[in-house]
Swiss-Prot record:
Catalytic activity: ATP + H2O = ADP + phosphate + H(+)
A GO molecular function held by the record: ATP hydrolysis activity
UniProt-annotated binding residues for Mg(2+): T23
Similarity comment: family membership: Belongs to the ParA family. McdA subfamily.
Protein's cellular compartments: Cytoplasm; Cytoplasm, Nucleoid
Function: McdA and McdB together mediate carboxysome (Cb) spacing, size, ultrastructure and probably inheritance in the cell, together they prevent Cb aggregation. McdA is an ATPase that forms dynamic gradients on the nucleoid in response to adapter protein McdB, which associates with carboxysomes. The interplay between McdA gradients on the nucleoid and McdB-bound carboxysomes result in the equal spacing of Cbs along the cell length. Incorrect positioning (aggregation) of carboxysomes results in reduced CO(2) fixation by encapsulated ribulose-1,5-bisphosphate carboxylase (RuBisCO, cbbL/cbbS), which leads to slower growth.
A biological process term (GO) from this entry: carbon fixation
Misc remark: A type 2 McdA protein.
UniProt superkingdom: Bacteria
Alphabetical list of InterPro entries matching this protein: AAA+_ATPase, CobQ/CobB/MinD/ParA_Nub-bd_dom, DNA_Partitioning_ATPase, P-loop_NTPase
Protein encoded by which gene: mcdA
UniProt binding sites for ATP: G18, G19, G21, K22, T23, T24, Q47
UniProt name for this protein: Maintenance of carboxysome distribution protein A
Annotated PANTHER family: P-LOOP CONTAINING NUCLEOSIDE TRIPHOSPHATE HYDROLASE, PARA FAMILY PROTEIN CT_582
């Protein structure tokens, strides 16, 4: 069941492994969702990557950002006022009290992972250790997909289906645009350069899938 109209919906982006595109997903998904929602991005990762990203830019990202790692405060994410949607960039440590607090508070978990077998194995472990016990709605998002060959991503989706783990239909393809946008403190929706439109379209498709889910 989703939150009532007086409370924001909470979407947490998590994976127990670093380097999978977690912060990139959180920032760009927040930007894509902000086209229709008033969005707050909460940086709950002690590394502060989302905050670093935002501080590099001079233009507004299209959403507000707050840094918070206190588990007691993270338990109350649904009580945040003034927003219809809260996106959380979580810490990568599965035994983190902050992560546990966010998972319990979340309405939806987005689980980014590259489609490579080793990355997928770590993601499946994350699902069993941190996601399934919570009972929170979740979907895997395949990231860093080679745009020249989608076969590995298709195979990864098949593996997830066989294990009963839901996944987004959309992929996030690997473009240099993502790194360059981050270095300039911009979301992929704001960055202008090679493959910018393709990269933006990927995140808009993910946002549309989430929106369809919420309207069911």
């Amino acid at each position: 069941m989703g939150p009532s109209s007086s409370y924001p919906r909470v979407v947490a982006v998590l994976n127990g492994k670093g380097g999978v595109g977690k912060t990139t997903t959180a920032v760009n998904l927040a930007a894509a969702l902000a086209a229709k929602e008033r969005v707050l991005l909460v940086d709950a990762d002690p590394q502060g990557s989302a905050s670093w990203w935002a501080e590099r830019g001079t233009a507004a990202l299209g959403f507000d950002l707050a840094q918070e790692t206190n588990p007691r405060l993270l338990e109350s994410l649904r009580e945040v006022g003034g927003y219809s949607l809260v996106v959380v960039d979580t810490p990568p440590a599965l035994d983190s009290a902050a992560l546990a607090a966010v998972v319990q508070a979340a309405d939806q978990l987005v689980l980014p992972t590259p489609p490579a077998p080793l990355d997928l194995a770590v993601l499946i472990e994350t699902v069993h250790r941190a996601v399934l016990p919570s009972g929170t709605s979740h979907r895997v998002l395949l990231t860093r997909v080679d745009p020249r060959s989608l076969g590995e991503a298709v195979e990864a989706q098949r593996t997830l289906r066989e294990r009963g783990i839901p996944a987004f239909e959309a992929f996030i393809r690997a473009y240099k645009a993502h790194e360059r946008a981050a270095l300039e403190g911009l979301s992929i929706l704001q960055w202008r350069g090679k493959n910018a439109r393709e990269a933006e379209a990927d995140y808009r498709r993910v946002a549309e899938e989430l929106d369809r889910d919420w309207r069911k």
